[in-house]
Design a protein with these regions (language model features):
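A residue-level detector for the "anchor" residue at the start of short, highly conserved motifs
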Residues: 2-174
């Protein structure tokens, strides 16, 4: 009946979506003052009705850097097509590519969850992990990559770096 229609309509998400074109970068502040820096050809969305009231959850595709406002009562979560990152207050980057999703933690601590088995790993400042869609595994990355945030900082650094890595970093940046 009509009452059912209103119930469904009232509970339907009120999505707010922010997108960037290739080559464009955009800083977005969420309702709780969390900063999201979107890289080119990326998007995020959140439910305006529920964000910061029931939970702090966003969905994304592409590459984004998050500086999360601390709120222990409501953890912040980011979902990609295959993974989820949950935090209290920290700064980190998610880079979702067709075959792998990578998380780089700058400050604080995150829980990185992936796959149907909901495998998870805790990452702290300076740590990175990758989830491979092909082999369905999370791998903690031990070597630090100073150029992971180059798109955000505007700086690339190379010292005795193999040429293939220089080319990879340059193609990510440009």
């Amino acid at each position: 009946g009509l009452g059912t229609w209103f119930t469904v309509e009232r509970n339907a998400p009120d999505w707010v979506a922010i997108t960037t074109a290739p080559g464009q970068m955009k800083d977005v502040y969420l309702p709780d003052s969390t900063l999201v820096a979107l890289a080119g050809d990326s998007w995020i969305r959140y439910d305006a009705k529920r964000y910061d009231k029931e939970r702090r959850a966003v969905e994304m595709n592409g590459k984004a850097f998050f500086q999360v406002t601390r709120n222990e009562a409501r953890p912040f979560s980011v979902k990609t097509s295959q993974t989820e990152v949950t935090v209290l207050g920290t700064s980190f980057q998610i880079d979702e590519k067709p075959t792998v999703t990578e998380v780089n933690v700058v400050t604080g601590k995150v829980c990185f969850t992936a796959g149907e088995e909901k495998e998870n790993v805790i990452l702290t400042a300076g740590m990175s992990a990758q989830y491979s869609m092909e082999n369905k595994e999370i791998t903690v990355v031990t070597e630090e990559d100073v150029n992971k945030l180059a798109w955000r900082t505007g700086q690339l650094r190379f010292m005795e770096t193999p040429l293939d890595k220089v080319i990879e970093d340059l193609s990510d940046y440009y």
